[in-house]
Amino acid sequence: MGRHTPVGDFRAYIQGCFSGYGRKGFKLKKAWIQMADFTAGLAPTTFSDPAALPETLDGAGADGRLDKNNILVRYLHTWRNHWTVAGSVELPSSQVDDSDPHTSLLRDYVPDFAFLGQYQWDRGHSHVRLAGVIRDMGYRDLTTDRNHHVLGWGAQLSSVARAGRIVTLYGTVCVGEGISAYLGDLSSGNYDLLADASDPGCLYAPLTLSGSMGAKVQILPRLASTLCLATLRHLPKANPAADTYKYGQYLSINAVYDFSPRLQLGVEYLAGKRKNCNGAEANVNRAEALLSFSF
């Protein structure tokens, strides 16, 4: 953070990790700089609302979690301490089905456009947000040798609100077509555009629904517990590939104790379910613990 510099006040942030699906070594997660109302770099998409997601120790988070980082340029302005609007141009990264022999992928070149409007109260600890995204995704029909572009769109209503001094409530509802790359479980596959089994050479953007709700209770000054419930629904047309994702369900409950501002210990139980379009399904139950030291 810099204050009273020749270019004004600014903030810079960088974050990385050594975990992730199928990855080894260091992974850069965020790297951005903010000056006045402008942000540039690798940052959370304007379409998301990380503050409205219940806290989990599970690194992957809920199955329908909308928590994607994009390279972007964003303008965000707040006035009267209650109203916020923002818009951003974000580097596209569509994830399109590449298994169809009748189509081929096109390079992304039209940016994603994201925007939000928000009302906040309780000194910024509570808010309601409506956000949206518009995407362009292209492919080539090999049966006619023609390029096609499909419009993707998404909308999310989210909120976080303090209910008294010890309880915080969270909630999100998201709907869209061609936004699978933004959503939890679906982001690990190529679900933004799928092959239409009834029309060779045609790809379409399937409808997706997701939602989450949760509550955090500050049991003691140093002990907090958080509950998270979530679901993700993927609604492709008739006759999708057998292993195509259909829906997922998620539950987690945790407790975190702060020994000091730098040292935390947490324990968590989580349960999840996934079902594919062919009826195959799997369930998981897991207990985990986390020891965190900050410096």
PLM features: residue spans?
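Outer-envelope exported proteins of Gram-negative bacteria
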Residues: 11-15, 30, 86-88, 129-133, ...
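C-terminal closing repeat unit and adjoining cap/tail of repeat-based domains
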Residues: 251-268
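Outer-membrane beta-barrel "beta-signal"
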Residues: 257-259, 283-295
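Outer membrane beta-barrel
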Residues: 1-95, 109-110, 114, 118-125, ...
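Detector for outer-membrane/organellar transmembrane beta-barrel domains
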Residues: 115, 120-240, 244-245
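Residues that define the transmembrane beta-barrel architecture of outer-membrane proteins
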Residues: 25-29, 34, 67-71, 109-113, ...
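Outer-membrane beta-barrel pore domains and translocons
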Residues: 15-19, 43-45, 90-92, 120, ...
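Outer-membrane beta-barrel translocator domains and adjoining extracellular loop/strand segments
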Residues: 23-29, 51-58, 92, 96-105, ...
